[in-house]
């Protein structure tokens, strides 16, 4: 019988496949796939960042403007979208690819009320929304089929090659 164990530790997902009743730990975990979040994922984290100290500054990526911006506060937590300096934020976020399927839904502006589809990374499904007709982002598909085809197999994780002795 095979068992699957999953662990998430500091943005790295460990998935171990093993056998029940094996005599040694080496036999119990015969295969291990390790995944880590793509480097740009922290830039898109929507969770609210809170800072313990209001002294000094930190930087975070503004998904609406597409730029890193300085914010008040240090010793921040709560979300992954915070960096010690503007330089570190720029290095991580400004040139990072942002696949359409990774973007949050953007309803746009206007009164067109166009039915469209977007990929919801939380549920890994294509969902319908009403598009205003102006601006928005590339996570905006004309049909559910186009959304599913574009985002098929999309993941915020990448496989890391590891050799286990």
Swiss-Prot record:
Family matches, as PROSITE patterns: BPTI_KUNITZ_2 (PS50279)
Sites carrying sugar chains: 90, 123, 161
A UniProt-annotated Pfam family: Kunitz_BPTI
SMART domains: KU
Protease found in the keyword field: no
Signal peptide boundaries: 1-26
Domain named BPTI/Kunitz inhibitor: residues: 43-93, 101-151
Compartments in which it is found: Secreted
Molecular functions per Gene Ontology: serine-type endopeptidase inhibitor activity; toxin activity
Tissue specificity statement from the Swiss-Prot or TrEMBL entry: Saliva (at protein level). Salivary gland.
Covalent S-S links between cysteines: 43-93, 51-76, 68-89, 101-151, 126-147
GO cellular component, one term: extracellular region
Organism domain of life: Eukaryota
Biological process annotations from GO: envenomation resulting in negative regulation of voltage-gated potassium channel activity in another organism
InterPro entries: Kunitz_BPTI, Kunitz_BPTI_sf
Keywords tagged on the record: Blood coagulation cascade inhibiting toxin, Disulfide bond, Glycoprotein, Hemostasis impairing toxin, Protease inhibitor, Repeat, Secreted, Serine protease inhibitor, Signal, Toxin
Purpose: Anticoagulant protein that modulates blood feeding of ticks on vertebrate species. Inhibits activation of host blood coagulation factor X (F10). Inhibits activity of host coagulation factor VIIa-tissue factor (F7-F3) complex in a factor X/Xa-dependent manner. Prevents interaction between host coagulation factor X and activated factor VIIIa (F8).
Extra remark: In mouse model of melanoma, ixolaris labeled with iodine-131 is able to recognize tissue factor (F3)-expressing tumors and demonstrates anti-metastatic effect.
Cross-referenced PANTHER family: ACP24A4-RELATED (PTHR45938), WAP, KAZAL, IMMUNOGLOBULIN, KUNITZ AND NTR DOMAIN-CONTAINING PROTEIN 2 (PTHR45938:SF7)
Subunit structure: Monomer. Interacts with host coagulation factor X/F10 (inactive and activated).
Protein name: Ixolaris
Lineage: Eukaryota, Metazoa, Ecdysozoa, Arthropoda, Chelicerata
């Amino acid at each position: 019988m095979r068992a699957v164990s999953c662990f998430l530790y500091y943005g790295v997902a460990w998935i171990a496949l093993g056998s029940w009743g094996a005599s040694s730990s080496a036999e119990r975990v015969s295969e291990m796939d390790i995944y880590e979040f793509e480097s740009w994922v922290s830039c898109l984290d929507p969770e609210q960042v809170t800072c313990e100290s209001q002294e000094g500054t930190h930087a975070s990526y503004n998904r609406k403007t597409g730029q890193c911006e300085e914010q008040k506060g240090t010793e921040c937590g709560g979300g992954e979208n915070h960096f010690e300096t503007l330089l570190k934020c720029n290095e991580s976020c400004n040139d990072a690819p942002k696949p359409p399927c990774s973007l949050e839904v953007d309803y746009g502006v206007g009164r067109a009320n166009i039915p469209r589809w977007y990929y919801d990374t939380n549920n890994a499904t294509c969902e319908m929304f009403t598009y205003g007709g102006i601006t928005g982002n590339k996570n905006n598909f004309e049909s559910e089929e186009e959304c599913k085809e574009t985002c098929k197999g999309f993941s915020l994780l990448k496989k890391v090659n590891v050799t286990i002795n």
